[in-house]
Design a protein with these regions (language model features):
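Non-heme di-metal
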Residues: 1-195
Length: 195
């Protein structure tokens, strides 16, 4: 269900990231490099994610039609809003939030998926499993260069550590919480800003 619910967001992500990349000032070289790679002009990450969906039992025909549940709509709208903002800082915060959330999700679920498909290896080909888990594996690995570029990009927009999340980050994160069906009681203070 999560695979299919995230698909519309994943499909829009290259466009959203490219909008932010193209709005950055010339002096934000690290940000341009990072967003240039994340924009996925060749749709490599998107193809990996589609293979993950197929491994989860979703047909390619199902991927042609968006499943726009309320949480999916909220996530797509939040990401679009901040990536299309005239203030590139908003888009940077939205993209960084989405990227860090993808990393956290992959690191927390990869082992579970690997165990499941290992236990059911007789039901899938080795290639299906490898291809289907590639997106999770990629996002669970550390990417030092990306981390350095991300830190420099955040320094360039002068994001200081603090007690509260910037609004774009909070709204994208809250939309993800809803989509992932995180317990509302645990996230109530964060969810208030997304309603």
């Amino acid at each position: 269900e999560i695979c299919l619910s995230l698909w519309p967001f994943i499909r829009e992500l290259p466009r959203n990231i490219a909008l932010v990349r193209d709005s950055l000032p010339e002096n934000m070289e690290a940000g341009k490099k990072l967003l240039g790679q994340l924009a996925d002009d060749e749709l490599t990450y998107q193809t990996m994610y589609a293979k993950q969906c197929v491994l989860a039992g979703i047909t390619p025909d199902q991927l042609k039609f968006d499943v726009l549940s309320e949480p999916t709509q909220m996530l797509c709208q939040a990401m679009r809003r901040w990536c299309e903002s005239p203030n590139y800082r908003d888009g940077v915060l939205a993209v960084v939030t989405a990227e860090l959330a993808a990393t956290a999700y992959a690191r927390n679920t990869l082992e579970i998926f690997e165990k499941y498909f290992s236990d059911h290896a007789d039901e899938y080909s080795k290639e299906e499993i490898e291809d289907g888990l590639e997106w999770l594996r990629l996002h669970s690995r550390p990417h030092t260069r990306h981390a350095i570029w991300m830190r420099r990009m955040l320094d360039d927009i002068e994001v200081a550590p603090g007690d509260s999340l910037p609004v774009p980050a909070e709204q994208v994160l809250n939309a993800l919480y809803r989509l992932w069906k995180c317990p509302i009681e645990d996230n109530k203070p964060l969810l208030e800003g997304a309603l």
